[in-house]
């Protein structure tokens, strides 16, 4: 476990994950442009059967196939990359040892994201034979994932602000 923690805290790993995350975000933006409609996992408010059917028709057969492929490849790797980055930053920023437990949040998010990818792949491959239940489950997962993203971002901001406050306090009391 200590080796894994050392790995994710390494500056080179953090830099590589940052660069890869940026590249992947740009690729997702291009994919969205190509598809002609938003990707389902970006709809943080969720979606319903009507939205799914409308978007699937906009994507077209080729778009659905490409989206499904990207869901298994690009979007399959993305949670591992941003998860490693988030875990590394949370561990590195932890002002107190007990705050390192916040690094569990990205693990939960990564699992949710991968589960969501499986659900979306299934919807893409089963179209037009979709069920309201399958769409509702995928939508709920997307909404929960959105909340998990906010929790991870809040933990990162909290850790960073705490570091800044402690550094200012030390500077004020030393100087």
Regions found by a protein language model. Name each.
Residues 32, 87-94, 158-166:
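Membrane-water interface at transmembrane helix exits
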Residues 106-112:
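Alpha-helical transmembrane segments of multi-pass membrane proteins
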Residues 2-69, 128:
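Interfacial loop at the N-terminal end of multi-pass membrane proteins
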Residues 112-165:
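Alpha-helical transmembrane segments of multi-pass integral membrane proteins
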Residues 7-8, 91-100, 168-169:
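Membrane-interface helix-boundary motifs at transmembrane edges
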Residues 70-91:
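Hydrophobic alpha-helical transmembrane segments
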